[in-house]
A protein has these predicted regions:
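Glycine-rich, low-complexity segments
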Residues: 1-43
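Terminal beta-strand-rich extracellular "head" domains
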Residues: 37-46, 51, 60-179
Length: 179
């Protein structure tokens, strides 16, 4: 593992940084790749089936194979912000995180967050750690997308509702982190 030495004035001394190594030698916890996406328009559904929201990361190109052992990396995925809403106190929204590798179809990774008791304006707050061994290798292109459903159907659920003055955009961020 390399050492980063700081000079007496707090500046990095470039002679002490070895940039010739490979990513597997990066210190544990180092973010080596990231991707993100944002949504600036409303999205709603009445479906009890999982529906793609369009909140999707830009492509993330893997630097290390996925896993949980030394010499591998994991991807932390976060969804936050936005303005959830429902047209009824009985409406319940369920959000999920899906993944696509190398342009293949999106597949469900995990439930993200859920909200019950409609008439609310609340942000999303969801995360997963993707350590799927063998699912992604060096050079693979990975994208994550948020999906939503109205549990039981029949109500309007807004994954994000644009309302002037109270709506911040939702974001999705994926970070590849060295184990």
């Amino acid at each position: 593992m390399g050492t980063l030495n700081l000079g007496t004035n707090g500046k990095i001394q470039s002679t002490n940084i070895d940039l010739s190594g490979d990513w597997s030698n990066a210190p544990s916890g180092t973010i080596i790749s990231h991707a993100y996406g944002t949504m600036g328009s409303s999205f709603s559904t009445t479906s009890d089936s999982q529906v793609a929201t369009g909140l999707i990361t830009s492509p993330l190109v893997k630097k290390l194979p996925n896993g949980s052992a030394a010499g591998t990396s994991r991807i932390h995925v976060f969804c936050f912000g936005g303005n959830r809403d429902s047209n009824s106190e009985s409406g319940q929204d369920v959000t999920l995180i899906y993944r696509s590798v190398n342009g293949q179809s999106y597949t469900e990774r995990d439930y993200a967050d859920a909200q019950y008791v409609g008439g609310y304006w609340n942000p999303h707050c969801a995360s997963i750690v993707d350590t799927s061994v063998g699912a992604m290798g060096v050079g693979d292109t990975v994208r994550y997308q948020m999906y939503v459903r109205c549990r039981g159907g029949g109500y309007t659920i807004w994954f994000h509702r644009e309302i002037g003055g109270v709506s911040g955009s939702p974001y999705i961020i994926a970070q590849e982190i060295v184990n």
